[in-house]
Amino acid sequence: MTDKESEQCTVSVFDQTPGSEQKKINVVVRSHFTVKRVIDLIGTQFSYEKFELLLQPHDNKDLVNLNALESQLMYEVAGFEPQLKNHLILLPSGSWDGDVTKRFELPIKRVVVKKVMKSDGEKAKSPATGEKKKRVVGEKTKKKPASGSSSPSKAKTTSEDSLAKTSISSESSPEKTSKIKTTAAKISKPGSEKAPRASPEECPELSTEINSKNTSSESPVAKKTAKVTSKPTLELLSPIKPSSPIKELDCEPVDTLSKQQLSEQLQLYPQGRNLISPVDDAPSDLFISDAEQLSDDDLALGASASPTMLGPGYDYGAPTGDSDVEGVTGVTDPSTIGTDDGTYPALSNFYRRKYGGDELRAWQRVNTTGADFVSSATTETEAEARQASLGPRGYVGLVNQAMTCYLNSLLQALFMTPEFRNALYRWEFDNDNEAKNIPYQLQKLFLNLQTSPKAAVETTDLTRSFGWDSTEAWQQHDIQELCRVMFDALEHKFKNTKQANLISNLYEGKMNDYVKCLECNTEKTREDTFLDIPLPVRPFGSSSAYGSIEEALRAFVQPETLDGNNQYLCEKCKKKCDAHKGLHFKSFPYILTLHLKRFDFDYQTMHRIKLNDRVTFPQTLNLNTFINRSGNSGEQNSQLNGTVDDCSTADSGSAMEDDNLSSGVVTTASSSQHENDLNDEDEGIDMSSSTSKSAKQGSGPYLYELFAIMIHSGSASGGHYYAYIKDFDNNEWFCFNDQNVTSITQEDIQRSFGGPNGSYYSSAYTSSTNAYMLMYRQVDAKRNELVAKVADFPEHIKTLLPKLHSEEETRVSRLGRHITVTDLALPDLYKPRVYFYNPSLKKMKITRVYVSQSFNINLVLMSAYEMLNVEQFAPLSRCRLVAYNSSMDTIIQSLESCTDPALTELRAAQNYSLDFLLEYRAEDQEFEVYPPNGITWYVFKVDLSTMAMDGPFLVYSAAREREASDVLRRSIALRLHISEQQFLLATVRATVPKAFVSYDPHPTPEALQHLQNMANTQFKSITYFYLNVPNTDAATLEMLGVPTVESVECASGGDVVDAAMMNGVAPGHMSSSNDYDWRRYKRDLVEPMSQPSPSHGHESNSEDSSLSDGDRTLVETDNMAHRGGGDSQVSSTSHSPQLSSPEDEAASHDAMMRVHAYCNGNGSYAAADVVDPLLLPTSTNHFFYATKVECVDVVGTGSSSGHQSDEEAQLRKPTRAYKLLVGTHMRMGAFKKHIEQLIQVPAAHFKLQRKHDNNLSNNQNNSLVHLIEGETLTVELGKTLEPDEFKAKIHFLRLADIDNETSKLPCVCEWVYNANTTAEQAKKELVAKLHRIDAKYATLSVQNCRIWLKGGRIPIKILSDDETLYCDMRSSIAAEFIVQECEEEVDPQPKDDSLTLFVRRWCPAKLEFGKFQEITLDQDSEIRLSLSQISDIPIDKLSYMKLNSNFPCTSISALSVNESSSWYSVPTTLDKYPLNSTQTGNIYLYKDRTVPARELTLEERRLMNAREKARLDRVGCVSTTRYAQRRERALKIYLDSPEKSSNVTASAPMDVHVNN
């Protein structure tokens, strides 16, 4: 870390929001932090989505609106003073009136300390104010407060409280109060003998107030203890200006006894903490040395005020705020500090739940033995006296390894089951194979969940004990399946232990499977056990669901009648008789698990589906009626079950597996609801009322309370699990969603019932988030337990607990602060990242090398060389790795001096988080040696005559100063392989030092000054991005409904460069091995030197005039991987520019890339020439330069249209790419104007797409460009929609064009319509549009045009001319319509009550399909008659069959048609099956049933089978690729995991600057 970056200060943020619970926080600000980063830091500590942030400077200066300066460095904001404590004001969004002269009254809190009393009324002399303190060079500065206190009476300390509290016993005289204000600390500077004190006026935050209040005591021994409380961020003391006035403070002396007592108390503080002592001349051994410098990742590692975010040094304790952690720290309300009675405010229930009421004070030392953990625990009464309202942060989440949400949900439910957790704690580990022992790893995980200071803990140790490798984390599984498999594994491991019957005692119930003869009433039973009860959501074959789990349970025990051909052979009657077959519950388990079977199979569509129907469940469930069966219970059950179909909730549809419910064939059930369903909204408000009657009627032990709801969100093909769980200690409900734990309400629980949202497609748009598994606990005062507290842990757990924490601390210290998720399959891996600059893509790529054996740098190089495809640039012999700090974009050193291939010392010095940079060299060059302690420079190459620029290139130099020097010049010349005397060099001061070089064979001071001026004004804030652009030819733009832009005449005589010139190199001149040819930048500088340089006075008024160090403002991000490497030339010299002769310059001049926007003679951007003056300040000059990239890197690009057809995806596929160098302070409006000129598409008709569908809105004309440096943007063509506009995909249907090779209807274009567009208007617009696209649509007219509404992949409705086009506002999927060109004699507008079908004739004699035809059936039409009219088949010889597949149903094999049993030949009308289950647009086959099928020989069958297979592959590879069913792996837990061989592998390379 450089000196510049190590500068930091503290700011206080005062929340002025009415009703705010957190009035003030403190934030650490580094010198390289942008305003936006500071706003983001503050936003993590408040629940507001948006807020106004103002800076209230000192000396009554005007307020500064920081929201308008987001890209500016915080240190450079006018009024921000790093030497002082700055104050930020947080206001609700839109509430500031813009009055900059207003001053906010800020509550400056001071620490209250009760006065230390002396006996005999004597006063000790105070030390002289301003006493000189000497500091030995090399020692750390010791922060020493200059405060003291005195009292007329003698001070004593209570020995009983000395280990638990830092207190000063005092006895004060009545009616006497004294206040003494002192400074909090003395700060001595290196090289100075005096450490001036800060006055309270200069640093009010550093003031300490010592109060003595009126108290009385019964005896000198029974004294009231006073708490010493300090401000939360004592570490963040601001340095004091030397010019600050020094005031003498009248401090009362502290007697020797008091100082000795204070010394004893302060020794209890943990090491590494900075403290403020009230003693002015306390001995030096009372003070702790300075904490280490803060890192950029510390906020994410523990700066939150949450109790789960403590570091390893604080066991169970809440932070006191003097932590050496960067970031935000909450400040306690003054009402909770230093109460008169010496007690603490009440502690919340959930915090007691986590820590069991056994808290250690925040300043108490961490215990290292099991006895210490228990003996140091306080009582429950003391715990309740702690600070309240810590919120659900007291619960710890579980890290999702990849797709292990199902595992996390079940583990949290088991952890929150007191009986299971306590029993697991009672189990004792008795062998040495820890890694493979499932109960032991589960026990450790539960201890972590109960005691860890983290926000979330890992599950990798547990999954390794399952025998899972890394691929298992990427498999989706069912939570109910996992529950059964895990319980089986635990039972196996618990054998021959005291917990052998744990699973059966808690979760096992019993039922009788019976058959009862209805003639002799003989009943045969077989007892079965169950761990969960699977409840169908719908009765078999029904489209209506059970309304509640009680109904489903009654249906579960409803007997089946065996009659007819299925009669029961009664042994007593000696004959077949009618019988009842069913289930009786014999006993229910203590923990009852109900599994709602929401996943089913639709035999019509032949797809898996998810049933999202509404099924209610109570919080109190009485099951005694299912055990206490009366004689007529069967009749009662029968009667109840008979009403299921009538009284259940309406069909809410099913979630199709294909494309998350949007792509399959959906059968819409009846939309009618039972009248009782009109009260669905009121259903379940009193969730216990549904069993209130049964609770009264059925008495017994089986009364249950709900405590866990496992929820699935998604479709049958995949989704996400999370859990709602109740804490039995406080009866509060929480949502456990992987790492996040939040409070929920009863409304959240009711929403988990499921049910429809009430849209046109009830089956396709039903809410897919609903309860999947429920857990109830039996209400039994004798058996119900509470979770074990720390003090109640068994002895072996008390021994394990400190070991667990020690392992965690060791892991943290070994891996350092940049901790990565451990790979499942490779437990002891070192996984370095290797970076490489790809010159073809002009961007940095990254791969991660997995080393499971002893580390060897040569193996890492070989693996990275292969994965990063470096072989196309240089052989392995000309490659090397250098040590690299990816978080800071800096080279650490080269490795020539390291003789150890394991790099043991270097890796240890970097906390084993060392990354590498892969470099290669030219054949005639040698690698440069990089000594340690150098500086990495960003070097840009610029041609001042054309303003062409490239870079940045990483150049490592031993030059420590951040100015141009001979050392830096030599490093640049060596690295870029150019003459040291033939280039100009200019530098700018920045967080990352930048240098700009320009070729000049005869450099002059004037030319150098010109370059330096340009660097200071135009170049200092340059960053870079990549832009992927699709095809923008006329045909493509017409299909997408996008117009073109007329070429703008060049202003100021600038050239307009056409698309061919955007490549930067003339055809045939491009060479990937010399992509950065220095000749491209050699220009005669005489002409630009004769032109006037930019006016610096004018520039000072531009947007970035107040920013002297803004070059990194755009790239700040909390994810360090995004900053790794920059877009830098990291290979050594292989593609470095070569020096060339002057004769080459003229030839290379034509290859020079010009910026597509226009530059005037001095190179500054003339914004007014192409940008609306309303969008930009008139004086704004921002740099913009684009150069075409040789290769298009489409990795990591996304689309906001998540459901694209193959044709559309091909249209939008990037065909060319550019590298953009842009000034960071450019407005989005100007940025898009440049892109508009670059791609010749109006700004209103394209979007800039980021990865993960994160669009940059077109409405950001007044916002700065906030992008991640080096990230790739993708141009997505399409009109920016107005509020009432919608985008639709248009497909074309002409029956004559469809054959067996047609897999689906082609998407011919996109079209924008509004909410008032009718089908008739749509016909006119679409016919005209299709005529413009292609001549093959010339026969289409408004008269023969029909518009279908497309649902999924089938046509579902014909729109009448006066009908408005439909759009579901809640769906992010674009609406789709089909334009059909109807054949002659076909009515484009059939009746509303008719049924239009597409039919094909099947010829069994030829084994061939006929052409597509269309028929329309009226209400009284008979399908055979209609088919006979379009064919020569008599009506009595016709057979027909419905095809259940996606339109046009060409994926059926000709060999299987004759074998189908679904042919019908009976008369059928619309009210009879199968037409009553048919929708408009379905496809039927028909045939002459009297024609026999052709008999094939073996050879003919073989040939036809091969031909059909090839055809289906051609059809299926297009139509089923996205919908191909994933091959599922069975969930297994291996009780004996095999060892895996060690090797070295590398991950696939990816873009460094993309959010992953």
Swiss-Prot record:
One of its GO terms (molecular function) is cysteine-type deubiquitinase activity. The lineage of its organism: Eukaryota, Metazoa, Ecdysozoa, Arthropoda, Hexapoda. InterPro entries: Papain-like_cys_pep_sf (IPR038765), Peptidase_C19 (IPR050164), Peptidase_C19_UCH (IPR001394), USP47_C (IPR045578), USP_CS (IPR018200), USP_dom (IPR028889). This is Ubiquitin carboxyl-terminal hydrolase 47. PROSITE patterns: USP_1, USP_2, USP_3. It is found in: Nucleus. Residues 208-219, 628-642, 661-673 have a biased composition (Polar residues). Disruption phenotype: RNAi-mediated knockdown in the adult wing results in the development of wing margin bristles. RNAi-mediated knockdown in the posterior compartment of the wing reduces accumulation of arm, resulting in reduced expression of sens and wg. RNAi-mediated knockdown in larval wing or eye imaginal disks results in decreased rl protein levels. One of its GO terms (biological process) is regulation of protein stability. Residues 396-779 form the USP domain. Residues 191-200, 1109-1125 have a biased composition (Basic and acidic residues). The keyword Cell cycle does not apply.
